[in-house]
Amino acid sequence: FARKFNDDGTDVDASGGSTPSATSTLVMGYRYFGNKNYLKSAKRTVDYVEKNIIAPADYFSSTLDANCEDKEAAIAAVTSTYYLAMVTKGKERQHYIDLCRKATYFALSWYYLWDVPFAEGQMLGDLGFRSRGWGNVSVENNHIDVFVFEFPHIMKWLGTQINEPRFGSMY
């Protein structure tokens, strides 16, 4: 799916970074309505995500404001693979779990594992703000961000699937 498009449907930015954003909606459509076309379409989105985002580690441009690599693209890839793992079985399910793990490690690279030493006189420094566990935004918009949505829940689930207890500690 194009990242940006006009009202008439023509592409403004044909980058496929927004593709995983459609997956959860398609999976839920399949669950609610039982229509296998939704599941087939969801799988096609993750086929694209695997080949163009996860495999080359090019988590790029899933939002309208940043035309660069960003954690939002990684979290969208994590979420899309999680949703497909939840509705598949056997080897297919394991494949989506493996993709989810790979995307999760990349997404975690955007989260602070330390407390940034903010200078005195800066608001966050004066407040004694601790940045550990908070996300950074992107290389274009370098600031602390609250964007996590389902990520902690997915990490906890993934930790049990792959026997990685560290993932559960984010929850």
Model-derived features with residue positions:
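Glycan-recognition and catalytic cores of secretory/periplasmic carbohydrate-active enzymes
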Residues: F1-Y171
